[in-house]
UniProtKB/Swiss-Prot annotation:
Organism field: Ralstonia pickettii (strain 12J)
Family: Belongs to the UPF0060 family.
Chain segments annotated as transmembrane: 8-28, 33-53, 65-85, 88-108
Membrane topology: Multi-pass membrane protein
Keyword annotations of the record: Cell inner membrane, Cell membrane, Membrane, Transmembrane, Transmembrane helix
Any single GO CC term annotated in Swiss-Prot or TrEMBL for this entry: plasma membrane
Keyword rRNA-binding: no
Pfam families in UniProt: UPF0060
Classification lineage: Bacteria, Pseudomonadati, Pseudomonadota, Betaproteobacteria, Burkholderiales
Domain of life: Bacteria
Protein name: UPF0060 membrane protein Rpic_4131
Main location: membrane
């Protein structure tokens, strides 16, 4: 259950980060309206706050989060960008998520 809680929180965190970076990309690369920078800033602030909800040390949290970020970014690639995933994408995400689980579920020192 702990792994599920961590993964869901990381997934929300990743979506907040991706939205916060994707909206400025739309403004700068596709000429979308500048007002999109406001929700982008709010999304990045949400991203930073969500990272603080994890009890682990910041560096460990960021390291474990990276695995989930990779998987969520690939889901974004498929659903938002409409790009089909390759077996290499799926395999890489599986490896990254395994790494996240190893880091996030390590025994706690007393």
């Amino acid at each position: 259950m702990e792994l599920l809680r961590i993964a869901v929180l990381f997934a929300f965190t990743a979506v907040a980060e991706i939205v916060g970076c994707y909206l400025p990309w739309l403004v700068l690369r596709q000429g979308k309206p500048f007002w999109l920078l406001l929700p982008a800033a709010a999304s990045l602030a949400l991203f930073a706050w969500l990272l603080t909800l994890h009890p682990a040390a910041a560096g460990r949290t960021y390291a474990a989060y990276g695995g989930v970020y990779i998987a969520v970014a690939l889901v974004w690639l498929r659903l938002v960008d409409g790009v089909a995933l390759t077996r290499w994408d799926v395999g890489g995400a599986a490896i990254a998520l395994t790494g996240m689980a190893v880091i996030a579920l390590q025994p706690q020192a007393n």
